[in-house]
Amino acid sequence: MPRPLDRRDFLVMSSAAFAAQWGFAGPAAANTMTTPVIDRLSVKVLTDSSYDTPRASASKWVKVRRLGLSAAGDYRKTLHNEWGLALALESQAGTESRNLLLDFGYTTDALVNNLEIMSVDLAKVQGLILSHGHFDHYGGLIGLLQRYRSRLPGELTLYAGGEDNFCRRVIAGSAPGQFAEWGVLDRRELAGAKVRLVLCPDPTVIADQAFTTGVIERRSFERVFPNTFVDYSMKDGIGCDIPAAAEKAGGKPVPDQHLNEHATCYQLKDRGLVVISSCGHSGIVNATRQAMKVAGIDKVHAILGGFHLFPADEDYLRQTVVELRAINPDVLIPMHCSGPGLAAALRNQMPDQFVPSTNGTEYVFGV
């Protein structure tokens, strides 16, 4: 039986070598697809890790609409915020509009409450996207389907980055070798709700207007910060089917590298790319450069979502800002797991691009 791998084994191995040895597909070649072009994009923040009192944010590139302290017409209803992320995306190309839900937060109750307050019409949703296999991004999904499947279109597809989105996740316990459950997405429940599953390890166009990066190539200084561990086994029909990884892990949980994490992107007419990195375990610079590579476009208009920099020290944040300044996006909107350190650094060093985010905000690009 192979020996269990520790985190050092993962850090000394290149992402490409690790992916090959563990049975994962590598990043796609450059310019493998023609990316669609849109005229307008609305991003509604349905679930985020913080909520602040509404305050104005000025940017010539994006219209920012902040929700008040309570729902319109009923002061008793207010937003619920929690650790996690869920976004409603509405894009428009010409006269055609498309509506997608990207990630689903930690709990169904918060997601459903905020969907209602932010006036998201489930009947118009044309697709679902899951960024990666962490519970705080899919926790609200099954409950949403159980409660409101009849409101959603009959033909509904969930686009996930790859097979490892369905692996069982665990977290380290109080004693060495002990682990506690941290969720697993059961594809049987998706099938029971008549949701078609499409895995997207390669770049994929979604609903004619969005596209995903596919597997994110890891070429920058960035590293995956310690997070969950992965159990690659199948138990009672639940889990992920990656035989090479299961064999190599030897039945032991191994540090999570999120090799099937992907970002959701749009190409905005005359502006450039909008890159949405829901959690950014792969690195926000890596994710953005992968989007640029897939689309064959150097101009990035906006980067938003989770950057997963709350564990980062000052040197790491400083290097991240250097790389972001080199990419030179017009707008930067860190959310969820990005951390107060990054927000402070961007406010200080990229004040014209930085837009602070809070739960219940709508961002409109292309106006």
What are the language-model segments listed below?
Residues M1-F18:
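N-terminal secretory signal peptides and thylakoid transit peptides that target proteins
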Residues S50-D52, A58-M118, Q257, E261-I276:
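Conserved beta-strand hairpin/beta-sheet module of binuclear metal-dependent hydrolase folds
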Residues F24-K44:
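C-terminal segment of N-terminal export signals and the immediately downstream linker at the start
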Residues L101-F104, Q126-G133, A160-G161, V275-C279, ...:
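Active-site neighborhood of phospho(di)ester-bond hydrolases with catalytic His/Asp-centered motifs
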Residues G192-L199, V322-V367:
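Binuclear metal-ion centers of metallo-dependent hydrolases, dominated by the metallo-beta-lactamase
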Residues D109-Y159, V294-L304, N328:
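Active-site metal-binding motif and surrounding structural segment of the metallo-beta-lactamase
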Residues L111, E247-D298, G305-H308:
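Active-site-proximal loop/helix segments of hydrolase catalytic cores
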Residues A180, V205-Y266:
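Active-site-proximal loop/helix segment associated with metal-binding centers of metalloenzymes
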